């Protein structure tokens, strides 16, 4: 059931950050758009890291000037990523084992092609399992 490629369910319109942006800029963007994390890309669109609200919180605890620091100084560069051809089942395992909420999807050149979320996998599973639309009232007892 989870043998389809992640490219079939991933989100392709992704808000990103650049390493030279300030943490303050990105914090405002994340608050405005209610985001918990952003992929960080270079100007060719290659994934170079990930910045999360936790990364920013951790940094502001030790750096009083955290808002003016650059994303590249705060971001996590050890990022688990998937390829567009990877299976939805692989993504599901990562979400369960690592408790990720979002995983970047990159091509062979490292360019960001999209992200897949745990919600994408849940929605995919429900649509495969139940051919008819699921209504909230049908789930609640």
Report residues per predicted region:
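A glycine-centered beta-loop-beta connector
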Residues: 30-33, 38-54, 95, 103-119
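The conserved cystathionine-beta-synthase
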Residues: 16-34, 41, 82-99, 106, ...
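Tandem CBS (Bateman) regulatory domains
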Residues: 1-13, 52-83, 87-97, 117-141
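Short charge-dense sequence patches
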Residues: 3-8, 20-24, 39-47, 114
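Short, flexible active-site loop motifs that bind/organize anionic cofactors or intermediates
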Residues: 13-16, 46, 81, 111
């Amino acid at each position: 059931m989870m043998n389809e490629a992640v490219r079939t369910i991933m989100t392709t319109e992704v808000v990103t950050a650049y390493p030279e942006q300030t943490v303050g800029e990105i914090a405002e963007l994340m608050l405005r758009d209610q985001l918990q994390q952003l992929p960080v890309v270079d100007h060719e669109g290659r994934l170079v890291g990930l910045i999360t609200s936790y990364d920013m919180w951790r940094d502001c605890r030790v750096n009083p000037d955290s808002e003016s620091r650059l994303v590249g100084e705060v971001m996590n560069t050890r990022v688990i990523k998937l390829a567009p051809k990877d299976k939805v089942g692989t993504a599901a395992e990562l979400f369960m084992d690592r408790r990720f909420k979002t995983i970047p999807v990159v091509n062979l050149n490292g360019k960001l092609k999209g992200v897949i979320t745990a919600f994408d996998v849940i929605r995919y599973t429900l649509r495969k399992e139940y051919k008819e639309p699921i209504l909230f009232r049908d789930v609640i007892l």
